[in-house]
């Protein structure tokens, strides 16, 4: 399961959180508001809102900010329309990228994404040129400082988890996208997760040297600095010294 682990990426993002807190919060607030606008403010009947709130909590967003974002979404009568866009691209050294965007201006987003890619040696791919390298899975992560590994594994397997991966102080439970809600609900009866999301996990990862990794990560960070970009998924293997 080590080939699928996102934990090195998660650690990298957490390490950069303080410097980019405002920008991260802006993206999360937008996602929460739109989820509430589309499906209402009840997390029990709105899975998208539940996942968005979970991401916000992992990023240490204050509860008050989350509640304001929900209220904003529910009460949004401005008629502003947001679009979800996904771009597939190749970075240097054949690293595959899936760029998820949320925007009220498709042309602006397309132009900016293309510009960042071209200036950093990357190229936009046709739909399907990259996505086949990833699989949509449920990802649930727990801290082993809080819970015994064997208890999490036992309940996860009983609930129907596809795979389990542990490293250091973290354990990840992998599910199918279809069974994610059911399995996470079972696990939530005993354990509080650090992360619970539907994620695109790479079938295989590309290993590069430190200099090459730095260049690819620089591109990813430039894409993530653009407000319309919500997430950049990749198949790069992050080595320890990069974290």
UniProtKB/Swiss-Prot annotation:
Biological processes, Gene Ontology terms: regulation of DNA-templated transcription
Compartment(s): Cytoplasm
Domain of life: Bacteria
One cellular component (GO) term of this entry: cytosol
InterPro entries: Integrase-like_N, TACO1_YebC-like_2nd/3rd_dom, TACO1_YebC_N, Transcrip_reg_TACO1-like, Transcrip_reg_TACO1-like_dom3, YebC-like
Keywords linked to the UniProt accession: Cytoplasm, DNA-binding, Transcription, Transcription regulation
GO MF terms held by the record: DNA binding
Family per similarity comment: Belongs to the TACO1 family.
Protein's name according to its UniProt entry: Probable transcriptional regulatory protein BH0025
UniProt lineage: Bacteria, Pseudomonadati, Spirochaetota, Spirochaetia, Spirochaetales
């Amino acid at each position: 399961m080590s080939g699928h682990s996102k934990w090195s990426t998660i650690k990298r993002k957490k390490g950069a959180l303080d410097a980019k807190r405002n920008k991260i919060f802006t993206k999360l607030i937008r996602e929460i508001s739109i989820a509430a606008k589309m499906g209402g403010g009840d997390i029990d009947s709105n899975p998208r809102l539940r996942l968005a709130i979970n991401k916000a909590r992992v990023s240490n967003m204050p509860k008050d900010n989350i509640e304001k974002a929900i209220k904003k979404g529910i009460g949004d009568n401005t008629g502003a329309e947001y679009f979800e866009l996904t771009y597939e691209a190749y970075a240097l050294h054949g690293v595959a990228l899936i760029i998820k965007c949320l925007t009220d201006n498709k042309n602006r987003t397309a132009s900016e994404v293309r510009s960042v890619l071209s200036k950093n040696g990357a190229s936009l791919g046709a739909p399907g040129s990259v996505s086949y390298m990833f699989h949509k899975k449920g990802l649930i992560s727990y801290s082993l400082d809080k819970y015994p590994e064997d208890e999490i594994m036992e309940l996860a397997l009983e609930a129907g988890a596809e795979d389990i991966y542990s490293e250091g102080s973290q354990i990840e439970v992998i599910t199918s996208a279809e069974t994610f809600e059911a399995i996470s609900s079972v696990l939530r009866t005993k354990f509080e997760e650090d992360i619970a999301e539907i994620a695109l996990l790479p079938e295989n990862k590309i290993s590069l040297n430190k200099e090459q990794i730095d260049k690819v990560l620089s591109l990813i960070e430039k894409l993530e600095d653009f407000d319309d970009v919500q997430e950049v998924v990749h198949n790069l293997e992050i080595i320890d010294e990069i974290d």
